[in-house]
Amino acid sequence: MRGAGYHTLNLERRSKSDSMTESRRLVYQTLNNENPVRVPRHVWDIQWTYEHFPQEIKKLREEYPDDIVWCPRFLKSDSGCEGDPYAVGTYVDEWGCVFENKFEGIIGEVKQAQITSEEWEETEQIAVPKAFLDLDVEAINEYCKQAGQFVLAGSSVRIFERIQFLAGTEKTLMDLYMDPDSMQPAIQKVHKFFCEELKAWAQTDVDALFIQDDWGTQISLLISPELWREIFKPLYREYAEIARTYKKKIFMHSDGYILDIIPDLIEIGIDALNSQIFCMGLEKLEQFRGKITFWGEIDRQQVLPFGDSEEVEQAVKSVKEHLWKDGGCIAQCDFGVGVNPYNVFKVFETWGKLV
């Protein structure tokens, strides 16, 4: 299987003690369906978590430490970002997109689009964040060496969402259906940059590259599967090929109902997928068991905020029943706004009893 030999090689190259390599070994065994001794853990938290539940998150980290971590975005020059993306107010990201946030703990919406004309060809309006290509490789590699866990790249690749941030969601979706060819200059400029960014991260000691795009509503894709395959699948294929070229794994996140494109993600070589598996239905996802690793989750809309102990336990058992096959599941769980902290503990307690 892809990555098995690289796993052993990288453990030796990073020269960690046996105790420091256990987390990485677990994740690779899970990705390769090699029957790990337990399920790898990954908690997703935000600043809100530490402000509202400091003792709970501290205890959780002590009792159920992560096996997967994000590498900080070590850059040699300033990113150009201004403000806090999760705080109330205005935030300017690395592309110069201005976000207005009215609620603490979640990223806001783009306030003003950069591509305001009817001509997508005017790509000079798109200023790519070149600072994101000038990685501090020494700092990244040192982080990977000291971390002990499976390390994900701090990459910012989100081709569909970035086009929306630059042009606005309404214009993006309308033109995808009415005149998709006109969008190609902008899409290709952003895509070329993202390929360069992934290649930069792939030449560090991180274990996996990371890409993300929210493709679904709660009941369907935002665009037709056919249109997705025509325009975006080739781009994701190239991202996955970069990972293979540099012998890295590749992880992807996408919210919403994306069942229709999961076979495509498997085909192009996505190793692990974080998605809203409960809105798609575990029974429907069972057909993909053993073909891709389900990187979480547990229902963060109903079960984590409102469920009782038995409901949380049953949710975890259902994931194990339908999606586990000698691996292929990561115990990922959100500890964000509105989540009951006791339910997060119950998630990992239950996984610990099952695997």
Model-derived regions, located:
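A contiguous, low-structure linker/loop signature
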Residues: 81-129, 146-150
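Segments that shape or occlude catalytic/ligand-binding pockets
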Residues: 49-84
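An N-terminal domain-start capping segment
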Residues: 64-72, 111-126, 155-166
